[in-house]
Amino acid sequence: MSAVTPEQAWEVFQQADCLFAESQVESALDNMAVAIRRQLADANPVAVCLMNGGVVPFGKLLTRLQFPLQVDYVHATRYGARIKGGELEWIAGPFVPARDRTVLLVDDILDEGTTLAAIEARYRADGAKRVFKAVLTRKVRPRKVAIDVDFVGLDIPDRYVFGYGMDYKGYLRNAPGIYAVAAVHES
């Protein structure tokens, strides 16, 4: 990853295209929560945050899921501080046993699908009864792996995006909406 200063990150934010305002993202999270409750309210699921990007959508969803569940997290990444994916690196988790349990994986974005598919495979290998996948955003693009998600907040164009958990070179995960990086800053 090329180093970026806070000032450069702020410039990226100021020049970005707002794809979805905060109110639109919150509405999408409301809709996701309703769908998740319908499917999983009686399943005693383990809700799993996929770090780091999943932390914002996970936290926002969690308080909307008014039913018994356990919380866990995993940190497995193909990106680290890079903008292009590499080999999958397992950093932490899972911690709550998944055998014979329903698992809900929550992430910020479905891009190529490789990371989410690998995490799903790990939970299936660990004996999960069912694995559901929820993503705040799904890029409209071909995937490197065949993967379907059960709950999607928003479909987004195939651009470099940030906000609501997604980052620009380690910054801007906290942006109050979903933004696309201007072409001048994409490298």
Where are these predicted regions, by residue range?
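PRPP-associated nucleotide enzymes
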Residues: M1-S187
